[in-house]
Amino acid sequence: MASPDFDVDAFLQQPLTARIATSGPTVRPVWFLWEEGAFWTLTGPWARLFDRVKDDPSVALVVDECDLVTGRVRQVIARGRAELVPFDVVRGRRKLVRYLGVDEALWDARFVHYLHDDPGERGTMWLRLVPASLTATDLSYSVAP
């Protein structure tokens, strides 16, 4: 990957929404965690994403922002083969806190269940994408006063 004009790790630490594409093509928005050089997102047998990745693990994922007020437009595009790996609560908590805040009492019950239900019974898994390619681009522009 060529060196982008912005800090990719800092960009990916923000609670942005990514979009992940599977064969078909099918694209869906996902919340993610960027850790250990990988994108982590929750899935399970209740989601079409789970079956699509089992059938064909080739995916593409984009995280971007477009701020019309400031002219900041940045994107990170990852491609590779996704893996379905066992869910762990500690990482799950980090991911959900990133989007919902630290106070679980304020969370919608469906998110609390990810942390307190048995992942084996529920079927909760991580989709982990270690990018085979990662492209970061800054397309920002100057805004006229």
Spell out what each predicted region is.
Residues 1-18, 72:
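Extreme N-terminal tail/first-helix region
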Residues 2, 72-145:
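Charged, gly/pro-rich active-site loop segments
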Residues 14-16, 28, 35, 55-59, ...:
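A generic structural signal for short beta-strands and their flanking turns/coil linkers
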Residues 15-45, 61-65:
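Short beta-strand segments
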Residues 44-48, 99-100:
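Short, solvent-exposed aromatic-acidic interface loops
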Residues 45-46, 60-65, 105-114:
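Short acidic (Asp/Glu) patches
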Residues 49-83:
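Helix-adjacent hinge/juxtasegments
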